[in-house]
Design a protein with these regions (language model features):
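Conserved beta-strand-loop-alpha-helix junction that forms the acyl-donor binding cleft
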Residues: 106-115, 134
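A conserved beta-turn-beta hairpin within the catalytic core of GNAT-like acetyltransferases
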Residues: 62-71, 80, 126-130
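A short beta-loop-alpha structural element at the N-terminal edge
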Residues: 1-14
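A short helix-loop-beta-strand connector motif used in the catalytic cores of GNAT acetyltransferases and
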Residues: 37-49, 69
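Conserved acetyl-CoA-binding loop-helix of GNAT-fold acetyltransferases
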Residues: 75, 81-94, 121
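Conserved beta-strand in the GNAT
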Residues: 49, 54-62, 69-74
Length: 145
């Protein structure tokens, strides 16, 4: 298995992977080809794919100069429980450290027991003192997987 930086040419295969994974929480703007292209332009050093003849894993990550954020981590269902997601997270953490980002955050659906267990094993803690809020500035259509 090889892990490398994600490039725009990966988009179709990455999108197919996202669609094969239940509960991804995609939307028509941020996860469109244009949305991902914009994200990769801003974050070329922190987005990765795992390959084994095809793309079997992906992690998107970015930062605002202070804090890193992880988005859309997905592993093909046939390749789960093999340490691939952990390796992708390690790549992101090294990339963030190289960018002098000292902390990383992410959002996981409350109902995603598998994801929440994984992130806990990676050392991510739940912030009981925070309430996550969101406001759409454009009309966004959720894409359920």
């Amino acid at each position: 298995m090889k892990i490398r930086k994600m490039v725009m040419e990966d988009y179709e295969k990455v999108y197919e992977l996202w669609m094969s994974c239940a509960g991804m929480g995609l939307n028509n703007l941020d996860d469109s080809q244009e949305g991902i292209e914009k994200f990769l332009r801003r974050n070329p050093e922190t987005c990765f794919v795992a390959e084994e003849r095809e793309i079997i894993g992906v992690i998107l990550a970015g930062n605002d100069g202070r804090r890193g954020y992880i988005y859309h981590t997905a592993i093909h269902p046939d390749y789960r429980k093999q340490g691939i997601a952990t390796k992708l997270v390690e790549h992101v953490e090294r990339a963030m450290t190289a960018l002098e980002i000292n902390k990383v955050a992410l959002v996981v659906f409350d109902r995603n027991d598998t994801g929440n267990s994984f992130w806990e094993k990676q050392g991510f803690t739940v912030r009981e003192d925070l309430i996550y809020r969101n406001k759409a500035l454009s009309e966004i259509v959720r894409i359920d997987t």
